[in-house]
Every structure is written in C-alpha cells, then in structure tokens.
C-alpha cells in the first residue's frame, strides 16, 4: 500500500499490453529460440497447458487461442534440457527449473541462449526436463581444473555455503517420465508452468513487491505462485502439494493489470465434492483427493462441499481468507471480490465461518462450531454436539441430533434444538438488545435462556428449564406454549447469573407450575 509499491505496479501496468485475445503456440521444429536442446511439449502435456490457460482466462478478460507452431504467437511453450554443449565446448551451468518472459520484456540473453532471428520475441515459457544425480563435491577453487580435466557436458553445479561445489551429473530419466506420464495437478512441474505463465503475463517474483518487514509473510506459495518459498508449518501445510491455480495475491495483481473476468461461472456452482465447475483444481472425487487452490467466481449461489472428509476442517467463506480442508491447512482461499454463499462440512469436528451475505452452513457429522456473521443465515448442525452462533441478521438455527448450543442475540430468529439436551440462548448481557424469536426446544431436557424482547417458546418433549434474565425497568413479553406442571420449570436470574428469590418479589402477576 506504499507509494513505492504503487509505482512498481504502475511500471508493470505500462509494460503490458492489455489484450482481449491472446494467442499461444506449442513450439515445434521451428528455428531454435532459446535452448539448443529445445523440444516441443509432448501431446499429453499440452492438455496441462490448456487447462492452466483456461484458469487464467477464468480470472482475466483474456481468451487464449492455439495456433500453428510455425506462426508468431504472444506466448510460446517448450521444453529444454539445461545440460547443453555451447559452441562445441564444455559448459557447466547453474540450475534453473524454468524460464519465461512476457511479450514486451527486453533483456540481454544469457550464455546458453541462442536468439531466433526469424521470429519476433514473444512471451516464452520453457520447462527444464533435465534430471541429475549426485556425482561429487569439490572445493570452489578447483572448479577450473575440474572443467578442464573431468567435466561432462551433462554436469550441473550447486554452490554450497561452506565454499564447496556439489556436482550433479545429468541423465535422461526425467525426459522419459515427461514423455510417458502427464504432469499431475499439484506437482512441482504443474506449479512451475503456472509460475512461468505468471512471468509471461507480467508478474515479477513476489519478493520484488515486498518493501517492508511486515509484508514478508506474503513471500510463500501460500499467497503466490511467484514465490520460491514453502510457507512455515505454522502458517500452512500443503502435504507436499504445490498450488494448482494462481493464488490469492497473484489473482489480485493480475486483475489489477488486466481487469476481472466477470462472466466466469455465473451459474450456481459447487466447489469440492460434487463439483460442476469443470476445473480439476476445484473438483474432488474421493477423500484421497486434495486441493491447493484459490477460488475466483463471478456470480450465482455457490457452495463449498467438503462433506466426505472425515478429518476436522475449518471452512471460511470470507474473501481473502483461508480454509483448512481435507487434512491440510490454509490450502483453499477465496479471491477478493468473490462471494461464496454456502458451505457443507464433513464428518469431523468442523468450524464453519460465514460472510456478510446470506449463508447456508451445514455441519454434517461431528461436533461442529458455526459463526454466521452478518446476513440472514441458515444453520444445520447435523449429528454431534454442535455450537451455533447466529450473530447478525435474521437467522434460522437447527441443532439436529446431539446436545447442541444455539446462541443468537440479534434480529428476529428461529431456533430449534432438535434431538438431545440442548441449550438455547437468546439473552444478551446487553439490556439494549431486545429479541424477536421463535424457539423450539425439541426432544430432550433443554435449557432455554430468554432476555428482553418478544419470544414465542415451545419446550418440546422432556423436562425443560426456562431461564429469564431480568433487567430493572425493562419489560419483556415471552410466551411458553407447552409448559407442563411438575415437569418444566421457570427460573428468574440477574444479568450476572444470580438466581432471583421470587418469594421476595413485590408483585407476581401470574406464575404457572410449582417453581
């Protein structure tokens, strides 16, 4: 939010052409553009690129069209082998997993690069398929001697902190793997394609935007695919997976540069299990599947469905916030300006957090915790001993099975404990919050706490206790429709939970039952 940050983003904005239609090509046997060991993307890997480009089109008003590899394109994709023979001499290089540039970028080619004279410089995305195994460790002072007498053109080096150099010798195993198997979503290579596409669309590495200490937390793949860092375990746990989409900060930056695609998934969509998004990064088929994704959605009444998982989860529907899903932590986020209305928890002890809009929050099995926030919300606890805070708005709270606690101090609400010995509280400690509630205790021995306002109460089956908070000078008007003598009881208490001795009261107009 500093002026320097704004200036940095402005420089990016000026360096990128805003385009409605972008074209790309998979490099074929055309004159070599970057690496002398360049190869075309294998056909089954082209499907991976197409899926990633569809995701980019989902968040940005850009349409990508595939064209002939013999034509100029705004984006070009290819593989390269980092182990190269430069001008017939031995060359030992440092390690890079991928390389990318955006269409307007200028720069001096590095030693390995051979420019293609017959094509305009496009945005390029090259992924390294060289693989290596440990060969030996030498002192840094001996590198020239090693290159002269022993080096192989397939060697690569890593500089260590102790003034030594680790030499790895290349093999062809990774190329064979890429040729035989499709890049899996959530793999490092899949993430690398997204990272390099980010560069081609104009993004720097995330740390280049960070100008003060408090923002350094953003330098991790929790927030951005443009980071090289995995998050600290206290901040997130992806279970060894990598981002499957552009992440929270990436989407914010890209939409600042290009604008937002406000036509993406305007219908009612489900993310997770039973997904109808048509995107692998948002779809789960069984409990073994995991996601590391940021959700962008333009409209409709949408749902996060994580109902089949048996682990404890945190589902947060607020934009810019993270959820802990499927045994991972902070692995699902919701992009800014995205509204997701509904959430379905799983079989564990889940926490469901609503947003300012009208939410349907379904807990499922387990002892679940609900926070509604603003909006007129519907809560369904499911089996287990649940705690539901309705908060602002006119809400409907249903505990279902289990010994539940239903709490809602604001608005005109409907609260139903369902089965079990439930506690229902609509009495705030603040005397200035009169309620207008319809309350059903349901089966079981329930405790119902009532305060100021108008309440229509049905205790239901069981031995129920109706606790009335009394405030000096404040009237309340509550009706109990099924009070049973010798079974139910009424208790009058002060705001600090001290029981009032009704025998010392000056006047009692009417009191039903024995107590």
Q: Which role fits each region the language model picked out?
A:
Residues 188, 221, 290, 298-299, ...:
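Parallel beta-helix/beta-solenoid
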Residues 1-347, 365:
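Zinc-dependent metalloendopeptidases
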Residues 71-78, 204-217, 222, 240-243, ...:
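Acidic glycine/aspartate-rich repeat arrays in secreted/surface proteins
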Residues 72, 122, 301, 312, ...:
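Surface-exposed or flexible loop/turn and strand-edge residues in extracellular/cell-surface modules
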Residues 73-75, 123-125, 224, 293, ...:
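Extracytoplasmic/periplasmic beta-strand context in beta-sandwich domains
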Residues 288, 297, 306-308, 345, ...:
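Glycine-centered beta-turn/loop sites at beta-strand termini
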Residues 331-334, 431-438:
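Surface-exposed loop/turn motifs in large extracellular/passenger domains
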